[in-house]
Every structure is written in C-alpha cells, then in structure tokens.
Amino acid sequence: MEESISGGRRKQYARPTINSYMYGNAMALSNIGLMKGDEEMAMKYALKADSIKTLVQEKLWNDKMKFFETLRKDTLAGVREAIGYIPWYFNLPDSKKYDDAWKQVMDEKGFSAPFGLTTAERRHPQFRSHGVGRCEWDGAIWPFATSQTLTAMANFINDYPQEILSDSVYFRQMELYVESQYRRGRPYIGEYLDEVNGNWLMGDRERSRYYNHSTFNDLIITGLVGLRPRMDNTIEVNPLIPEGKWNWFCLDNVLYHGHDITIIWDKNGNRYHQGKGLRVLVDGKLVGMTDKLQKLICENVL
C-alpha cells in the first residue's frame, strides 16, 4: 500500500502484509513437502512459518488497540488499517485474544462505511488526509483490500471458534462489494472509490479502468457459496448466506482435485428440479445433501 497513515512505500517498516505473505508461502512449501513425502523440506518450512508467526504475534499486535499494526523503527504505528486483517488470510493467529480485531468491521468509526470496508479506521484524525490520486490507502475503499479482508473474514468465520461475526456480516459486505462495482450504470471496477458516495476516484484514467485486481470469483466460490479448500479427499461446503436471503443458487463446473464439482441450493426444489435442499455433486454424482442451508461435509468422495 503506497501511501498510508502508518507509513508510505519508502518507509522500511514491518507490516502485517509482507510478513503474513511470507508465513503463507512457508506453510505452502511445508505442505508441498508433506505431499511429496519430503520430510526435511516440510520441517524446514514449518519451522520458518512458526518463527514468522511468533514474530507477527509478538511484534505487530497492539494489545491496547486490539489490532495487528505496522511496526515502525521502535514503536507500533497506533492506527488500525485493513492490512491488519491479512494474518487471518493465512490462518496465522492462534489465540482468541486476537478476535476483538473483527469488531471493527461492524463499527462505523472503524471500517464500516456506506459503500464497504475502508482501508483505515474512520475515527483516525489522518483518515483521507493524503489527497486524491496519490496512491493513497488512508481510508478510501480499494477492491484489492476488500478482497483480502473478505477472504480473511471467511477464514475467521469458518476456521475459528468465535462468536463475533455471523454470516450476515459477511453477506452484507459482499453485497456492498458487488453493488459498488458499477460506474455510470455499467459494470466497472477501478483502483479505488469514495467510501461515502461510492464514486470511483480517478475513474476517467485509463489505468483505473483496467485495474481488475480483486478476487471476485474466489470470494463467491470459497466464501459465499462456501466450497472450502482442503488437502484431503473430503468436500466441505459452508455457505455464508443468512437464512431467508436466497432461495436458490447453483455453482457448476468447478474443477477441484481433478473433479467437476456442482453445488446446488434449492429451498423448494422447483428451481433446478433436483430435490429440496443443499446438494453436492462430483462428476455429476450426488455425494451429499442436507435439507437446510448449512455446513455440509462429504467425506472421502474424491
């Protein structure tokens, strides 16, 4: 993030972003080692990941602010920014003490704005203080940052025993994310937009309209519909759609572990004529179902 409240691109600070990415890379390499039967490789990168996790939790967590922050030369920045949610993108945090950070996505003085999640907390005196068109991440809404936060949020809801966020919070933020991607009545995604009126900032610049750096499809597949990636032969589906919001949906032709996956939700059974409820099919064969829109685990079906 080029220009931010915690420090711009030229400041060599320790941030939740890069350190979380390194943790994710190390964990991925460790898992690759396990998959190929290379115990030495798996252990090497697992130890690297563990070391990074310890440093992130010890050095970047502000216990007073209840948030992961940027570490300047010797002190934390003292500002909550959306990058503080990226540790959950890789399931890095390992204690409930960090859960309170997620309360800020529902707080209008935190990150909650009429058109989505801001890149910095709205209560901060330097919010939106860097001007416009200067690559500033000081509050305006960036689809890239929103994508990261929503992925982290889905992980937090799915992978942690927590009572702070419900599927309705995720669903509403996804609605805002989708609704914001229009300009002059046509589908559009640019660099960033105003958090209050939804106008795209610098929308007439060529580079902005080619700035499709969100992860829209992944948010729909793994978050909203809820196909949760796993290493084993089990399919896990947990739609983050509140009861009563959608009566039907179909996610089809998803290549997963070399198989064609279909996920159907048909509340009354009269939309797709495959029966009532939530159904999972692998290569056209039914492998699991439930009457309600809820978590469904289909073991050893791949």
Q: Which residues does each predicted region cover?
A:
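Polysaccharide-binding and catalytic clefts of secreted carbohydrate-active enzymes
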Residues: R10-I18, N62
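Non-catalytic carbohydrate-binding regions of carbohydrate-active enzymes
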Residues: K36, E40-T70, D100-H259
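Charge-rich, acidic-biased intrinsically disordered regions
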Residues: M65-G84
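Short, glycine-/Ser/Thr-/acidic-enriched flexible segments
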Residues: D74, L92-S95, A154-I157, P242, ...
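Short Gly/Pro-enriched turn/cap motifs at secondary-structure boundaries
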Residues: Q12-Y13, L76-G78, R209-Y210, L251
